[in-house]
């Protein structure tokens, strides 16, 4: 089993954190230590487990690594990886402080009642077995503001930067071993306006844009990704692309997971989702031909 442990390089280094992928039986793990571990950007770790497949995997991994390895390795990146390793191994007390700060934020948010704590609903999903306590996902629409607008105003008015925003939520991340000012964050959060709560008197209707974005269902696959990507293609207006086969991978960010793959039929709900995401503050679509997703590349007939 290969695991992309992008946001879990700190897992397993504190009793309050989930177990790391290696401890759970993974054979090969890529940990993006630059995200939450503390190493410099562009640095990461590749771990090979001492499991039944290790002897077979090691020469294959070594061969693949040498294929892309730089002949001018960065001493700065390597040193930062070693410092990160040491900080995680010896930082139990510091991580305790980080977890306590995150729990304080969630506790106050619950007590005040304006915003929702997304993680409080995780128990309803059997496939969620653990959650990172250092990631604080908050339902901003419950508090009358979109996630994108909340993120923008938190930074503009309070110099508070959250990790990511969606139409309905923000995610604040506490670095493992860091000591955030929880009171400052909570004050800034609860000073946000609530424009979505403004309604026409007597209308009972929601404000424009009140309905949250929902992930589109994937369209049916008509070709393999290889056939669609390498085959002849043409560019059409997004509206015309509905019902045609995509030649590109299109991924709305956040979170950056593909919504349309080469070879899949482009649906109207996918076009709407991609364009609304692109129009939102901080949103963009990877793989799109232009920022507004006005044109799409499709497989030529």
Language model: regions and residue ranges:
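Conserved PLP-enzyme active-site core in the AAT-like
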Residues: 1-121
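Structural motif
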Residues: 1, 27-28, 45, 135, ...
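PLP-dependent enzyme catalytic core of the Aspartate aminotransferase-like
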Residues: 153-157, 163-301
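Short, glycine-/Ser/Thr-/acidic-enriched flexible segments
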Residues: 34-36, 51-53, 83-84, 141-143, ...
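Solvent-exposed alpha-helices and their adjacent loops that cap or buttress functional pockets
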Residues: 20-24, 36-40, 128-130, 163-166, ...
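Short acidic (Asp/Glu) and glycine-rich catalytic loops that position anionic groups and cofactors
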Residues: 58-62, 80-88, 129-134, 164-170, ...
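Conserved small-domain helix->loop->beta segment predominantly found in fold-type I
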Residues: 93-170, 176, 197-219
């Amino acid at each position: 089993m290969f695991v992309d442990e992008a946001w879990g390089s700190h897992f397993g280094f504190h009793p309050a954190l989930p177990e790391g992928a290696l401890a759970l039986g993974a054979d090969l793990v890529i940990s993006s230590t630059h995200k939450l571990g503390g190493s410099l950007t562009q640095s990461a770790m590749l771990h090979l487990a001492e499991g039944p497949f290790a002897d077979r995997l090691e020469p294959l991994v070594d061969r693949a690594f040498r294929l892309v390895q730089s002949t001018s390795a960065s001493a700065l990146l390597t040193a930062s990886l070693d410092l990160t390793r040491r900080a995680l191994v010896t930082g139990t007390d510091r991580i305790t402080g980080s977890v306590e700060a995150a729990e304080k934020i969630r506790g106050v948010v619950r007590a005040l009642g304006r915003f929702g704590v997304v993680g409080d609903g995780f128990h309803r999903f059997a496939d969620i077995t653990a959650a990172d306590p250092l990631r604080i996902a908050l339902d901003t629409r419950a508090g009358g503001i979109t996630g994108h607008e909340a993120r923008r105003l938190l930074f503009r008015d309070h110099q508070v930067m959250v990790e990511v925003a969606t139409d309905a939520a923000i995610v604040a991340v506490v670095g493992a071993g860091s000591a955030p000012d929880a009171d400052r964050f909570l004050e800034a959060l609860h000073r946000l306006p609530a424009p979505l709560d403004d309604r026409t008197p007597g209308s009972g209707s929601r404000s424009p844009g009140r309905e949250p974005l929902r992930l589109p269902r994937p369209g049916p696959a008509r070709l393999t990704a290889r056939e669609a990507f390498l085959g002849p293609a043409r560019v059409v207006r997004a509206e015309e692309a509905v019902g045609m086969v995509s030649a590109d991978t299109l991924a709305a960010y956040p979170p950056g997971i593909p919504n349309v793959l080469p070879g899949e039929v482009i649906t109207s709900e996918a076009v709407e989702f991609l364009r609304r995401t692109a129009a939102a503050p901080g949103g963009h679509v990877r793989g799109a031909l232009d920022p507004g997703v006005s044109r799409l590349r499709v497989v030529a007939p």
